[in-house]
Regions:
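Conserved acidic donor-binding segment of nucleotide-sugar-dependent glycosyltransferases
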Residues: 299-311, 319-325
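Carbohydrate-associated surface elements
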Residues: 153, 171
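Membrane-proximal helix-turn-helix segments that form the acceptor-binding/catalytic region
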Residues: 67-78, 92-110, 116-118, 127-147
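Conserved catalytic-core segment of nucleotide-activated headgroup transferases in glycan assembly
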Residues: 12-28, 38-39, 173-176, 184-254
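Acceptor-binding helix/loop patch of EC 2.4 sugar-transfer enzymes
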Residues: 42-57, 108-138, 173-175, 187
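An aromatic- and histidine-rich active-site surface loop
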Residues: 10, 14, 19, 83-106, ...
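Nucleotide-sugar-dependent
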Residues: 90, 201, 245-281, 287-296
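A short, well-ordered alpha-helix in the C-terminal region of glycosyltransferases
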Residues: 326-341, 347-353
Length: 360
């Protein structure tokens, strides 16, 4: 059997990005004669120090430990037929490991799903941002045999440094993510957002919209935020919930409307619309900022909405709050879009064919 080594930051099942880009295809690849190995450098305790602690020494210790873990991973690298690097081998300025792999007689694939060349540092990690170099991607891409990325915008950037590029959109396991019948007896409409502690700032971008809607509809609506359990907003009655893999499909299905506000900047243009696709996969109407790949996914008013400005956000959300039939119509259309274009089952053979061709 052929063997692929996937180099990523997080353990299997921990990172949504890793799951939607490659982890969910492991079973399919293995049934087709390809063994998949994931080598991660950040454990559960490291995550607490990286994402929740402000102790710089603890963060630096995570970095040092990650460095030595990577060296161990690469000791037997020549036993693999292909190496797939997700975003970077180690989260520092260094490209030492990528250079090391490139000198071996093993093809290397670089996969990314964000505009990672743009600086975007969370508040909790600002003091160690000097250890990062967003532009190192320009040094990594030329070292690779092939590049895979999530949309045209990312591909256009990568093409400056490497011509061997395949665009593979991030996809949803539609056998897992599917609608569940709602039993919302009180008629309250739940408006949901899913993200993380580092992206909650995007949810907050349109707080003025939420406050006006809350003032208008009062207890008829409820805002739900998943992914940052430390988040609180007294006026909106929000207490953030933890993202839990075991119940994530139920969590998404608890929404009546899904939202994805984004800033209008270079970083947002690189996003692959994953939040919106997840809402759509469970037939929840998706309301997304009119930017980047969102415009490729959504046909405004048909399978979702792309409001521009506070006034349109309020108008669109008000229509959906007041009209259950519209929510169902848009939700069903969104689900159809995902099944036709962004389903794991539609994309899995693309990965198989690409990886197989690179290992010949």
């Amino acid at each position: 059997m052929k063997k692929i080594l996937f180099l990523a930051h997080h353990r299997i099942g921990r990172s949504p990005g890793q799951r939607y880009r490659f982890e969910q295809f492991f079973d399919f690849l293995e049934t087709n004669g390809i063994q998949c190995y994931l080598a991660n450098i950040i454990n559960e305790n490291d995550e607490k120090n990286l994402y929740h602690s402000k102790n710089i020494l603890k963060k630096l210790k995570v970095g040092i430990n990650s460095f030595f873990r990577r060296w161990k991973h690469l000791k037997d690298i020549e036993s693999f037929d292909l190496v797939v690097v997700y975003r970077e081998v180690i989260p520092t300025k260094s490209t030492l490991f990528e250079n090391y792999i490139s000198k071996k007689n093993i093809p290397m694939v670089f996969d990314f799903d964000d505009a990672i060349w743009v600086k975007d540092v969370s508040d909790v990690n600002k003091k160690i941002s000097f250890l990062k170099d967003e532009k190192k991607i320009e040094k990594i891409i030329p070292l690779c045999k092939h590049i895979t990325c999530g949309n045209d915008y990312l591909a256009n950037y990568a093409s400056k440094f490497n011509s061997n590029i395949t665009i593979i959109p991030s996809t949803v396991d539609t056998d897992l993510y599917k609608p569940i019948e709602k039993h919302n007896k009180d008629g309250q409409v739940k408006i949901g957002w899913v993200g993380s502690h580092t992206t909650v700032k995007h949810f907050e971008m349109i707080t003025g919209v939420y406050l006006k809607l809350k003032s208008k509809y009062k207890d008829k609506i409820d805002f739900v935020l998943i992914g940052d359990e430390t988040y609180h907003h007294k006026k909106l009655g929000i207490k953030g919930l933890k993202w839990e893999n075991k119940i994530e499909v139920e969590l998404f299905n608890s929404f009546d409307i899904g939202i994805m506000p984004l800033p209008d900047n270079e970083w947002a243009k690189g996003k692959c619309g994953m939040k919106g696709l997840l809402y759509m996969s469970v037939a929840i109407p998706s309301v997304m900022s009119n930017i980047g790949m969102n415009k490729d996914i959504i046909e405004h008013g048909k399978n979702g909405f792309l409001p521009v400005g506070e006034k349109q956000w309020i108008e669109v959300l008000s229509k959906l709050i007041e009209n259950k039939e519209l929510r169902k119509k848009i939700g069903d259309s969104g689900r159809k879009t995902v099944l036709e274009k962004y389903s794991k089952n539609k994309i899995k053979k693309t990965y198989l064919d690409l990886y197989t061709s690179l290992m010949k």
